[in-house]
Amino acid sequence: MSVKTKKFVNKKYTTAKFKVTPTGKCRNKNNESIKKLIFNNGTKINTGLNLLLTQPNQVNIPPPPKILLDRIREERKRMVSSANSDITVIDIELCWEIDKFLAHHFQNTDSSKNDNYTKSNIKKPINAFIAFRAYYSQLGAGIKQNILSSILSEAWNSPETDQNIWDIFAQQFNFASARCGFVNYIMAQASSAP
């Protein structure tokens, strides 16, 4: 009994099976407009791209808005003068000396927490308001969360708050995929700035 085998012949087709007609203008690979890009300080101008500033020119962390400091001061006075003497008020100096206050608290961070980093710990990207809230909520230590949240949102919407700077900080943090929190990341960036 013989087994039949099939042989496949490799046919070379010389005619196209279908035809494609472009609907618009075809882009030339040597487009003159691409060659004429204007560069200014290392960034492209008029390219239609969103550029992420990974190393901005000395963007400093802005001091807290005056309305934020005033409202926190009022809330602390209200907490002290209230009849609830069992509430412990943490007295944070309101003159906002970043180098002395925050550097002291974040100097001895535990690096062993970063060793246990897994895919399940990946966080959602933060926006500008979340960055603002995370950084300045430290000033309201001891104040109830719901009161502090309303104070921070009022400060965020005040005209003296530059929201674009916080947007840059949030984009940098999201791009870097830092394993630490936002406040630790931004303090490390501020201390390493030239």
Swiss-Prot record:
Residues 121-177 bind DNA. InterPro entries: ALPHA1_Saccharomycetales, MATalpha_HMGbox. Its main location: nucleus. Keywords: Activator, DNA-binding, Nucleus, Transcription, Transcription regulation. Pfam families: MATalpha_HMGbox. It comes from the Eukaryota. GO terms for molecular function: DNA binding, bending; sequence-specific DNA binding. It is found in: Nucleus. One of its GO terms (biological process) is positive regulation of mating-type specific transcription, DNA-templated. PROSITE patterns: ALPHA_BOX. GO terms for cellular component: nucleus. The keyword RNA-binding does not apply. The keyword Nucleus applies. Belongs to the MATALPHA1 family. Mating type proteins are sequence specific DNA-binding proteins that act as master switches in yeast differentiation by controlling gene expression in a cell type-specific fashion. Transcriptional activator that induces the transcription of alpha-specific genes. There are three genetic loci for mating type genes in K.delphensis. MAT is the expression locus that determines the mating type of the cell, whereas HML (containing HMLALPHA1 and HMLALPHA2) and HMR (containing HMRA1) represent silenced repositories of mating type information. The mating type is determined by the MAT locus, which contains either a copy of HML or of HMR. Diploid cells are usually heterozygous for the MAT locus. This is Mating-type protein ALPHA1. It comes from Nakaseomyces delphensis (Yeast). The lineage of its organism: Eukaryota, Fungi, Dikarya, Ascomycota, Saccharomycotina.
